[in-house]
Amino acid sequence: MSPTTTRLALLALASPFILPAAASAHIHPDEFAPSAFIEAPETVDCTLEDGSEARCHRITVGYLPQGLEIGPFCPATLDDVGGIWDWDGENAGLYRVDRTFLVMLDELGYRFFDDDGTVHVVDIATQQPADDHACINVSADESVEITMLLPVNPVMAETPAMLGVVGKVGVSLDGVPIFSDAPSVLMTGHMPALDTCGGHIDPGGWYHRHATSTDIDTVFEGAGVAAHCALEQDSSAQFGYAFDGFPMFGSTEADGYPAIDLDDCNGHVGMTVLGEAYHYHASEDFPNLPACLVGVQAQNNFSTTATAGIGATRAGQDGRNEPPRPMNGGPMNGGPRGGPGGPPPGFEQAAESLGITPQALMEALGDPRGGRPDLAAAAARLGITEGELRAALPPPPGR
């Protein structure tokens, strides 16, 4: 064995993320539904995030695929049933947005309804929430067009890119964009409820998903949630493509057995209907999407003609609002920290009560861009109990 061959073998053994480089995937535009595009896909020159030049598929979709029915999101009253929400506070879990769930939140200090049972519902495209806690139900803008770039030949990155909150994941085969976790109620005080296919409307007026919708019934069954997505459910089918160009499938292999030997991004090299290549799998828990992407994405790979929201190229031109941001910049007993104005009220006092500096507390909680911190791990770093840390942190908004 030559020195070069030996070195490559050692590198392959050292990192599961290097193995897929030898098993490249290629995007097949004909895998998408004919109704996915409002313009025929084009192959164009593009620059990847590592600075290298490449070729990308440029695909353009509308605010919503033709014929796709969405919702419901927010219930009008406690007697109605809305969509779903992945609650990450006390009694964490996936819930239907209904009376039982909203009353539970009320008992925890998050009141989303009036005394007569009317739920606080707000269209943040037209107005900011007037209540401490409101269910967000955004109006659509049928004029919006979305343009995305996907590498024709995926390239493995040196290290995976963590997705965090509202990170760009990819696009489903019906043309709906996919993003990672929606903002937590613990971050903003408000609930951007999802429909039972895991989607909702962005402040810019276009529909997107936060789940693998064609395998979401697997999640509902495991979580004991009485919900169903009207899309055809197939745990072994391809769901879409990630923004790094690698395909995404449901939670099982083609033979119906669970996917095994998955890396931290829930992917591996294996045989698919597209051939043997690296691909991602959905998980059986919500959100059932990859936590990271292993490939290199294209620069400026997502833009919209909207006047608000993610990727908006005409921000502020028609008066649509941006979404509510984390109040005071966090931290809200589990939400992200930091903000333009520095530590929020109560953060320095929390550090003082623990006998540490604000900087030490911030470092223990970790990077705010990664979403809700692991309080148990942060407490362990500080040498205290999780209960002591929770008690010291400022309360969530509106409490």
Question: What does each of the following model-derived ranges do?
Answer:
Residues 186-194, 204-258:
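Short helix-loop boundary/capping segments
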Residues 144-150, 172-176, 202-217, 273-287, ...:
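Extracellular/lumenal glycan-associated surfaces
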Residues 192-199, 261-269, 363-366, 375:
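Short, recurring structural edge motifs at helix starts
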Residues 26-187:
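Solvent-exposed N-terminal domain segments of exported/luminal and surface proteins
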Residues 9-20:
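Bacterial N-terminal signal peptides
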Residues 314-352, 362-377, 381, 390-399:
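Disordered, low-complexity segments in secreted/periplasmic proteins that are enriched in proline
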Residues 2-10:
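Bacterial N-terminal signal peptides that target proteins for export
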Residues 26-36, 45, 260-340, 399:
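Long, compositionally biased interface segments
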